[in-house]
Amino acid sequence: GKPAGKVGFYPGVMMASQDEIYITIKGKAGHGAKPQSAIDPIVIASQVVLALQTIVSRNTDPYEPIVITIGKFVGGTINNVIPDTTELSGTVRTLNEKLRRDTLKLIERTIKGITQAAGAGYEFRVSPGYPELNNSAKETAFTQSSAIEFLGKENVFKGERFMFAEDFAY
């Protein structure tokens, strides 16, 4: 946080878009003692989670921030049974609309490739969230000069970009 009485301004895209992703990996249930008779969705989902991180590190420009976070991973209910499905959900955040669309396509392509290779199926659903917060340069400059006038230049600073999302983006 910043000290009270200080305000920051950032013209242009300041906060990320935010989408929720929901993934179901569809395997084939089986007994833990006979894994060869099952298609283990937990193992496949684990591969998906790891592979999604390569989208960030290997498929996007390092100067274009992107976040893919899987925050929920649920598979199975009994310790000696391979379940038939595993559920994943997470968030995707970007700072430009094209990267947002491209990232969601790459996510599905990654899931499809891994599940096909394992003989499994999948469902992929996106719940679109907030767009990126884009501050108008003109209005930002006007508001910043007003803040300098009322608070003093020493209390006004250049803000920074965040990968958080904000409903004010609408």
Model-derived segments and their meaning:
Residues D19, I78-T86, I114-Y122, K138-T140:
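A glycine-rich, aromatic-flanked flexible loop/lid motif
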Residues G1-P83, M163-F168:
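Histidine/acidic-residue-rich, glycine-tolerant segments that coordinate divalent metal ions
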Residues N79-K105:
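A conserved active-site cap/scaffold subdomain adjacent to cofactor or substrate pockets
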Residues I44-N59, L106-A118, F142-F150:
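Generic non-transmembrane alpha-helical segments
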Residues S57-V67, Q116-R125, K153-R161:
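Flexible, glycine/charged-enriched surface loops at secondary-structure junctions
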Residues I23-I25, T86-T94, F124-P128:
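Short, hydrophobic beta-strand segments
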Residues Q36, N96-R101, K105, R161-M163, ...:
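Active-site glycine- and acidic-residue-rich loops that bind
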Residues R125-Y170:
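An extended, acidic, His-containing surface patch that forms the Zn2+-binding/catalytic region
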